[in-house]
């Protein structure tokens, strides 16, 4: 009997890094379930799309139940939201929304897929954090809280699961050249950021996808519990 293909879930996959990750895993021969908030997205054959808003508790609950039936081998928690604000002005509802999408949802999805990974003695979990989950700066309290927390969860998962053949890692992108980054930074901001990056350019979504592709592959047999920065040297040089 031919071995079935690995099956992956990639959240936040309608554009940018998430789309690039879904596309790359498909090229690697992996069946992909992609999520997003759009009702319809054009994907290549081999990608199934599940629309879900992670701020909607009932939709999240339905998606969790769906995943429990899908025999998921690979989970990439990429979906995230952000709001930049001075600490004293942060609205608690905004804070709760950011933690719900960036931390609570990955927690629930991990709980949904890990039982199958344990049964199969194989699994790969990649949580997309951020440079702001490794360092931080002013006006990032909500986002950094969620991303530092997500990395903490990754380390806890690795300590608990790595001996079962389940490897869990975080990937922390820096400034990536996406439509969202361009809209937030503007032309002036883009130029300023590029000057601060040792490589002198923004990263590309396909570079994030390439790293994730390797981390979830059978070539990765010994990396677990790490928060790997992919930022052109921004946080270290």
What are these regions (language model features)?
Residues 110, 146:
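Active-site helix of classical SDR
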Residues 115, 159-160, 221:
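Alpha-helical segment proximal to the catalytic Tyr-Lys
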Residues 122, 202-230, 235:
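C-terminal substrate-recognition "lid" of short-chain dehydrogenase/reductases
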